[in-house]
Structures are given as structure tokens and as C-alpha cells.
């Protein structure tokens, strides 16, 4: 008699409307229960029985109920699943396939089957890309996935690379090339500079050589520098299939052990690469640097032919300048080039120290592998004088390009850095005041004031203060119109010196050429391409970090590291512990609260100040040097747990 009763239907509707509901993100725990995070301040408890219907990271709506005198969230509706397309490891049981998602907070296998178009035969230990097609909160009795493609077979030493690239949907092979891409298409006049003593300085094993340099002393102690850059845009037509592919990739993806090129290797490592004794087309820039270090305003961009006279390595050049080895340049003319470039480098470092912002030297770490791709060691690489020679030359070239584009077009792809936003600027001023460093918001939000602040901090040389100030700084970005680069201390900056490796530099090449050729219909780059380049840069950076984390866990699980003591620097303070970097090899480790002090209530982690207090006393802070011992290597989550060695 109650069937289709409108009064009953209305009553149900009213009850549903009155039942409190919330939306949020599911957060799981090690102990089976979870929480629904509504915002940074508010979360609701999800009992273990209800957690069985959701996954960590799911966005859901839930009904709020009182159960055993506690307010709980009962998942009701799936808004957006955490898993859609995902990567995981295959397990085969009783001829049935399961996939274990490769995400730290997901602990359960998901039943799966290959998609009809997927021809791979999967075995235990293989890795695959999958798509979640059934979710319990949608009324399905189990979670279920479809295998889209195989990533890599079990026990392949390249698992860390292929799985990570697949996770981030990044390419793992070089682009395909067509015959037309090998033909030089630009018939514009080129100056013949093949008689000049151009040299390249790079790593021993570098094959994609972008830049060559020639320098000479002219009147009054001034220096004339010609920067010659490889010219791939004379081979790759704008809008061609390869150009579209390069735009999509954005960058050559440099990963531990190898790279995935933006352009086909036949272009990037052969036809366009400025290999020694090979005649190559280039886009060149002639710049005069005055004896006080200033760049002369008269800048000339032009097309040319060059022939590099020697491929030099950073280590050999640095050793020779520092008189540390028996190596010496092949000829007096090459020797003279190195000496003049060294002089220019010191001149510009002095100028930038007083007028801009100088980079602080930092350690870089490089993995070493066996012939079969097994990680064997990590070596420290320091930035030496030859690195600085190239760096200063490229900075000169990029300042010149930005100036040239601004004067002639008013647009391009500019590298920018905004310094501090207004809110963070207030935090910086307040923080510095605690150390009797007096600055104003108005002052440090100008380029001049920001540079002055950085110079003061460089002189102060306090790692803790520097780390806190860096935390407040904006991230680097790209802009279509001229804009300052606060982190470099420059009014404008536009890179064009790596067109083999960066699509933004290819865009700037085409714009510079259009000015040289006096084209009238020059198209301004779109905001869309700028955003895509930024996003691709972010994804590449995350992939490189993820692979490194994986390799560190593989390396440090070896027996010889079990009880070894490591010097480390604290780099972050979180709610549950501290993160530190091992100085010997660059690995990041986590030290949980329990390993710092047995009574949790007596521990205070202040994330804002980056300090850890025990019973109200400051014990640790970011930048502190500590000694740690590895406690646990978690290969599944690629995390390294350590404890402080007291």
C-alpha cells in the first residue's frame, strides 16, 4: 500500500536532505581505519569496515553519523577515484591475475584482466599500466582493473626508469624522424666563421652539444664574445610532425644514467650537434663585454657557419686552469681561448656579485651503474671553474637575447622569477627582524632590494636563515612578455642556448631569426604553449626525483650500509618527523618522531620555523648537521628510515 506513495517519497527526500553530509579526500592509515579530510583543519573518522569500500586518495561524499559516542563519516558516493589510469606490479595466483598499485598508501591487490587489445602474457613480477573499471562505492562487490599494456618484465634492471616514466605518462624513446627532417631548409645568408677558433666545453660523454664559444680581446681591454648555438630550427619546420612532437615533449628528459631526447638522436647528437671539426649551421650572437664587466648595449644576432676546433671537458679545462694535471690544450690558440674565457668568467662573477645575484655552489650527485644497469655507487660532482666559464658565457648570451627580443618585438619566452609575493614578503621581514636584519616589504619586493637582501645573506652565510628565506621565495616561471628574474637579479632573461634540449629555446630561435630576416608577420607565442612547457618541466623533475629515490633504496639495501654511520643535513621538519640528506651520496632519509624521543606528547615539530623541541627545549632545526644510522629500507614505498646516532 506504500508503493509509489508520494507522501512517503517526500518524507524520504526530506530525511535525505536533512542528513548531514560532507565531501573530502580519504586518507588511510597503517591500522585499517582512515579519515575524511574536508580541509586543512577538519577531518572525520572512517571506521575500518567502511574503509574497505574506498581507497586512499578517493574524493567522496559521506554521511555523518554518531557511532559509539563518536562522529564518523560513512562513505556514500564516489566523486572522483584516486586510481584511474595507474601503474602496478602483477601477481599471478591460481591462474588469476592481480595488480598491486605502485602507490605508498595502497596496500591491497586488485583483481584484473588484460584488455582485449592487450596481447601481452603477464606473469608474477611484471609491471603494467592499468585502468580501474570497478569501484566498490559504485555498487560493485570488488575493485577491478583492466590491464592496458605491459611496461616491463620482472627482473629487468630498467624497471625503475620504465615504471616511473609510464606512471607520469612520459616518453621513453627518441622521436621518430622522417627524411625531410634531415634537410637544411633555411636558405638565408650565413657568415662563414669556420676559420675562427671556436671551442666547446662539456662533459666527457656529452653527445648533444648545443654551444660553442669564440673570444678575443679588442681595444681598451674589452672582450668580444661570439656565442654560436646549434640550429635545429633550420631543419625542423614550424608545425611539422617533428615540431609538434618536440613541443609536446618540451625538453630532453635527463634521468640518472641516460636521457630521453626531445629531438631524434640523429639530429641532436649528430647533424645539429657542434661536434669538433664538423661544419655546422648556427645562430650566433656577437657581444662586447666592457672591462668593468658590463655588457655593451650593441648586440648582433646573425646566422653563420662554424667549425669547432676542439671538444674540451669540464674536468680537463678545470685541471689545467688550476694546474692539477698534465693535460694541456692541443694548440696555443685553444690555450688562448681558455685563458680569455677564464678572464671573462672572473670579470662577470665580480660584476654579478656587485650588481645582481650569484649562485651559491652546491654539491651534485651522480649515480654509477654496471654494464647491465645495476646501480653500484654515487659520486659527488662539484661545480668547477670550467662549469662557471660556460655558465657565465650562457648568462651573457641569454641576457642579450632577452634585451634583443624586448627591443625588437616586446615578446618571447622569458624565464622569470617574482621574488616574494606580498604576504611572504611580510613573513620575510618579520623573520629577519628576529636576527636584527632590518628590511621593509617595499624594499625586498623590488629587484634592487631583493638583490641587496641576497647579498647580505651571502655575506652572513647562515644556512638556517638562508633555508627559511628560500621557503618564502616564489618558484621560477615562464612569461610571454619581459619580466624580471629576481633569483638571478636581472631585469629580463630569455634562454636560447639549448634548442636541441628545450622547446622554449626553439621558439626563441625562430623569433630571433624572424628579426634577423626582418619578417613583418611575427606570431606571438601563446599562453597555452607557455603553460604546457611549465607543466612538462614539472613532470620531468618529478620523474627524475622518483627514479633517484628508487635507485637509492636499491643501493642502500646492500649489506655494507647496514650499520654504517652517515653525516646528514636536516632539510625539512614535518608533523611526524624530520627529513635529512645524506651528505655522502645525496639520499633523503626520514627520521620518525619515535626515533627522536619516546614520549610523543613531549615532542613539538614546528613546521613554520623548521625546528624540533623536546620538553620545550630546541633540539634540532633545519640546516643542522647530524649523524644517522639507517634503520629500514622500504623498497615498496622507496623510502629510507634512519635514526640519529647519539
Swiss-Prot record:
Q: Does the keyword Cytoplasm apply?
A: yes
- Which SUPFAM superfamilies does its entry note? Nucleic acid-binding proteins (SSF50249)
Question: Could you tell me the EC number(s) of this protein?
Answer: 3.1.13.1
List the GO molecular function terms. exoribonuclease II activity; RNA binding
Main enzyme class: hydrolase
Protein location: Cytoplasm
Q: Name one GO cellular component term.
A: cytosol
Query: Could you confirm whether the keyword DNA repair appears in this record?
Result: no
Any idea where the S1 motif domain is?
563-645
Write down the Gene3D superfamilies for this protein, in alphabetical order: 2.40.50.640, Nucleic acid-binding proteins
Q: Pfam families given for it?
A: OB_RNB, RNB
List GO BP terms, alphabetically. Answer: mRNA catabolic process
Checking InterPro entries in the record gives: CSD, NA-bd_OB-fold, RNase_B_OB_dom, RNase_II, RNase_II/R, RNase_II/R_CS, RNase_II/RNase_R, RNR_Ribonuclease
Keyword annotations from UniProtKB, A to Z: Cytoplasm, Exonuclease, Hydrolase, Nuclease, RNA-binding
Q: Which residues form the RNB domain?
A: 190-517
Q: Which domain of life is it from?
A: Bacteria
Instruction: Quote the catalytic activity from the record.
Output: Exonucleolytic cleavage in the 3'- to 5'-direction to yield nucleoside 5'-phosphates
Query: Chief subcellular site?
Result: cytoplasm
Summarize the protein's role: Involved in mRNA degradation. Hydrolyzes single-stranded polyribonucleotides processively in the 3' to 5' direction.
Q: Identify its protein family.
A: Belongs to the RNR ribonuclease family. RNase II subfamily.
Task: Give the matching NCBIfam families.
Answer: 3_prime_RNase (TIGR00358), PRK05054.1 (NF003455), RNase_B (TIGR02062)
Please state what the protein is called: Exoribonuclease 2
